[in-house]
Amino acid sequence: MESKDGARETISEESTVITKNEWTFFNPAQKFNRDISIEVVKECFKDRASIRVLDAMSATGLRGIRYLKEIGNSIVYLNDISQSSVDTIRSNVLLNGIEDAEYFGSDLQGIKESGNARANVVKSDCNVLMTSLPCFFDVIDIDPFGSCSEYIDSALRAIRHKGILCLTATDKGVLCSNERKCLIKYSTSIMKGMGMNEVPLRTIVSLVSRQASKFDCSVEPVMSLSIDFYVRIFLRIVRRNPRSVVERNSHVLMCVCHNLAEIRSGQREIDSRCSNCSRRMRLCGPFWNGPLHDVKVIQGVLGGMNGGNKRLLGILRYLEQEIPTMFYYEIPRLCSLLGISTIKQSRLMHALANMGYQVSYTHSELNAIKTNAPIASINKVLILSGAGDQERMEELGVEFNGNEGVKALESIEFFKGLLKSGMGPLPLPRKH
């Protein structure tokens, strides 16, 4: 919300106010990003007396000041490389009535010796800052313009045991469909058109897990979200069990018919011929093959909400019911490949669940499902539904309704109309 205070224009978000000028970068589409970050950090550290939070690219200070005002046990370090941004941060800290503040400039060693203030403003390259303070922060929030890949190593050095690494990547187009750039930036080979909005999540978590193993660390995904034009990922960094990286990352054979075949570590023989259509499949990956969310954290956040933020509530409910299988199936795309009319999502879910398979919605794509059913079974259901052959349905035991588990999912209010904000990225403001 924007307003004028005399000659000064301001922007308010929740309880935080910042000044607005021609070089202020504020994207209202990222409010959800900030909202969920507050809730995740609050839930993960609710039993801690104090936590150190790094807002690595603070810009106006909005995100960091919200951490300060909404998480009572936080000590926040608001960093930016730009002097004009640092001046703005200091001004906005005072504007929000935070007097317990300290300014370090580029005195990174002074940070270790201090720590008495709740708000700490720093002027530094964030990679230099994180490298200079090993195992120092409980939370590191990295929200760049573009890729997050170049900051991961430094963040892993600076995060404490069981700290939370919060990553944003706004280059979702690269992660979804630019095969060459994705391989260069994220060291993962992708296939355009396959589970497009979940591929970025499993690509980034895989990259972080592989980088973490170099520092004798492992990762535990807390939440992984593919929202609008960006992805937002929360990872718990555990300073042990680096060997889990081998078990938790897989290559995947992908086919244009949407068949998938996971290749686990140590698998000696690989048949690249598709079992569904007999075409040659394409080798992609590595991808994170484990769960993308910690359901206990999600339930904890849901339990503490008052229901006012319907978009946040709906997306958390989506995450809570998602099954951990790799990727999802877009119903219109599958029906197009089969040359049949699109069927309702609910019919496919009921049929597969009645056949004994796991099914769920996915927050990544509204008209898609997650399931552990093989593509052959999915196609069989789609074809039977399109043909309307009741005798054949009964013969194969396919029922398109009546599954209690799916009924329970259908009864949940997900606020589907709010899943997408309809807003896109903004250009960076001119330099000051």
Swiss-Prot record:
It comes from the Eukaryota. This is tRNA (guanine(26)-N(2))-dimethyltransferase. InterPro entries: SAM-dependent_MTases_sf (IPR029063), Trm1 (IPR002905), tRNA_met_Trm1_C (IPR042296). Residues 9-382 form the Trm1 methyltransferase domain. Pfam families: TRM (PF02005). It is an enzyme of class 2 (transferase). Dimethylates a single guanine residue at position 26 of most tRNAs using S-adenosyl-L-methionine as donor of the methyl groups. PROSITE patterns: SAM_MT_TRM1 (PS51626). S-adenosyl-L-methionine binds at R34, R63, D80, V128. GO terms for molecular function: tRNA (guanine(26)-N2)-dimethyltransferase activity; tRNA binding. Zn(2+) binds at C255, C257, C274, C277. Belongs to the class I-like SAM-binding methyltransferase superfamily. Trm1 family. The gene is TRM1. Transmembrane segments: none annotated. The keyword 4Fe-4S does not apply. Keywords: Metal-binding, Methyltransferase, RNA-binding, S-adenosyl-L-methionine, Transferase, tRNA processing, tRNA-binding, Zinc. One of its GO terms (biological process) is tRNA N2-guanine methylation. Its EC number is 2.1.1.216. It catalyses: guanosine(26) in tRNA + 2 S-adenosyl-L-methionine = N(2)-dimethylguanosine(26) in tRNA + 2 S-adenosyl-L-homocysteine + 2 H(+).
